[in-house]
């Protein structure tokens, strides 16, 4: 068990190359994994439980008259109302979700899901610029980012957006 958001997982069975996850019948999400003898994650699965509340298809029609079916909630959402429809967060190229909510760790204690933002280095000590599928599979709870784009959103600076106004003032904008 890597994390769960509602203590839904009650047990596991690993037999005949098959992982069985038992849940308590409540709504929620979990991320479970299998490891090798050395503790390296071999694969992980997102468990999404929605007893008695299966997602429905909503029909949408675009301006050209084409119809599309869209699930009535985001992947990982436990409901469709304002408080429960958000769901989980996926980053490009990753199969496993991230959550911004508090979760329960493997020890059963409340924890923040993403609790480290590591910089990955290559074997010669330089910062790694690419991450392969093997790394992502073995580190499903590690948020990987590089370069200026990621730092743009994680770096706090009041002048970030280039506002030329002095601190504690604002520019008035008017229409011509």
Placement of each model-derived feature along the sequence:
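Low-complexity "stalk/linker" and mucin-like segments enriched in Ser/Thr/Pro/Ala/Gly
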Residues: 1-16
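Long, low-complexity, polar/charged, intrinsically disordered or flexibly structured peripheral segments
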Residues: 2, 116-170
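Extracellular/luminal low-complexity segments enriched in Ser/Thr/Pro
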Residues: 16-27
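A short beta-strand micro-motif common to beta-rich folds, especially ectodomain repeats
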Residues: 28-36
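GGW-centered surface loops in extracellular recognition modules
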Residues: 40-88
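Conserved small/polar residues in nucleotide/adenosyl-binding loops
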Residues: 173-174
């Amino acid at each position: 068990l890597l994390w769960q958001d509602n203590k839904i997982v009650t047990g596991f069975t690993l037999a005949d190359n098959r992982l069985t996850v038992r849940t308590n019948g409540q709504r929620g999400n979990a991320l479970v994994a299998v490891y090798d003898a050395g503790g390296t994650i071999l694969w992980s699965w997102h468990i999404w439980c929605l007893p008695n509340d299966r997602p429905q298809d909503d029909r949408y029609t675009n301006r050209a008259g084409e119809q599309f079916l869209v699930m009535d909630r985001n992947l990982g959402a436990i409901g469709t109302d304002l408080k429960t429809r958000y769901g989980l967060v996926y980053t490009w190229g990753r199969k496993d979700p991230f959550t911004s909510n508090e979760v329960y760790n493997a020890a059963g204690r409340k924890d923040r899901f993403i609790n480290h933002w590591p910089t990955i280095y290559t074997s010669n000590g330089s910062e790694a610029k690419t991450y392969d599928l093997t790394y992502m599979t073995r580190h499903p709870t590690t948020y990987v980012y590089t370069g200026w784009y990621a730092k743009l959103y994680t770096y706090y600076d009041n002048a970030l957006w280039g506002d030329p106004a002095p601190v504690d003032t604002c520019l008035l904008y008017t229409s011509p």
